[in-house]
Curated annotation (Swiss-Prot):
Gene Ontology biological-process entries: protein repair
Record's GO cellular component terms: periplasmic space
Organism: Shigella dysenteriae serotype 1 (strain Sd197)
Keyword set, alphabetical order: Metal-binding, Molybdenum, Oxidoreductase, Periplasm, Signal
Protein name: Protein-methionine-sulfoxide reductase catalytic subunit MsrP
Pfam families: Oxidored_molyb (PF00174)
Principal EC category: oxidoreductase
Length: 334
């Protein structure tokens, strides 16, 4: 496995650009002007946080035992733990980047189970201990690219999804893998109020082709920065597909179902002209309302130090995954 390219940094990003995209998305989803005004104070709080004031705590989960295979270690500059845990999209807990860290503490994972079903010979139901006991954990330093044109580099901890799917023994009819997030309105304010939750249809669902799910880069993730995932990052287990935009990385997964048919996905249902099923990172295919040619890397500095850099095709993983899409029109199948 080739090591990843080093990311170069250039061109400072203005503060006004940093928060513009979210409001555009909400308007496209039909959220009212009154609702759009709700996160304004939170935006101000987040600006203060990026300047170094009142930062949320870094992940404080249980320490994990894991290896560090050389193939997944690299010289990429890491995004600090407090930013990984404090700057998130998890609309079930609110629309602003700071809302998940503020509100996700109510998420209870002690009775959590994950069901694997559908086109499999051996359906499974696993708890969190099963995941950490059955599969050796490893740290992988991955790029993470949001569709909103910002990026991080994160040391995730987990195991390849293909190892989990192999236990269930997919049948020859399995062509896709459908994922579903926990639906817990009593713990998730975004499920109680459509304005807090962005007007999306819940539970959040995502999907991959089976060959994408079986690729060795695709990671079932249970930790970050050496510890168990905090709730705002998708505890107890989330998906990481590093060559795709971040919204494909479904959080707090309770169901994995192998299917014959193309599964629905939340953002594609909400805005099919803007969010495709594949969602491969591609600097040559813009979002209808902003360019994807460059991205703002969130590193160790404050907001005035956030750097703009070129977006890499497949987020820098083209050597590993481009063959999955040979003959596929990436503009048509975005």
């Amino acid at each position: 496995m080739k090591k990843n390219q080093f990311l170069k940094e250039s061109d400072i990003t203005a503060e006004s650009v940093f928060f513009m995209k979210r409001r555009q998305v909400l308007k496209a989803l039909g959220i009212s002007a009154a609702a759009l005004s709700l996160p304004h104070a939170a935006h101000a709080d987040l600006l203060s946080w990026f300047k170094g004031n009142d930062r949320p705590p870094a992940p404080a989960g249980k320490p994990l035992e894991f290896s560090k295979p050389a193939a997944w270690q690299n010289n990429l500059p890491l995004t600090p733990a407090d930013k990984v845990s404090g700057y998130n999209n998890f609309y079930e807990f609110g629309l602003d980047k700071a809302d998940p860290a503020a509100n996700a503490g109510s998420l209870k994972t002690d009775t959590w189970t994950l069901k694997i079903s559908g086109e499999v010979a051996k359906p499974l139901t696993l708890d969190h201990d099963d995941l950490t006991r059955r599969f050796p954990l490893e740290e992988r330093i991955y790029r993470m690219r949001c569709v909103e044109a910002w990026s991080m580099v994160v040391p995730w901890i987990g195991f390849p999804l293909h190892k989990l799917l192999a236990l269930a023994e997919p049948t020859s009819n399995a062509k896709y893998v459908a994922f579903e997030t926990i639906y817990a309105p009593e713990q998730m304010p975004g499920l109680q109020d459509r304005f807090i939750g962005g007007g999306l249809k819940y539970p959040y669902v995502e999907g991959l082709r089976l060959d994408e799910a079986m690729h060795p880069l695709t990671l079932m993730t249970v930790g970050v920065y050496g510890k168990a995932l905090p709730p705002q990052n998708g505890a107890p287990v989330r998906l990481i597909v590093p060559w795709k935009y971040g919204f494909k990385g479904i959080k707090s997964i309770v169901s994995i179902k192998l299917t014959r048919e193309h599964p629905p996905t939340t953002w594609n249902l909400a805005a099919p002209d803007e969010y495709g099923f594949y969602a491969n990172v591609n600097p040559h295919v813009d979002h209808p309302r902003w360019s994807q040619a460059t991205e703002r890397f969130i590193g160790s500095g404050g907001i005035l130090d956030v750097q703009r850099q070129p977006t890499l095709l497949f987020n820098g993983y083209a050597d590993q995954v481009a063959s999955l899409y040979r003959g596929l029109d990436l503009r048509e199948n975005f």
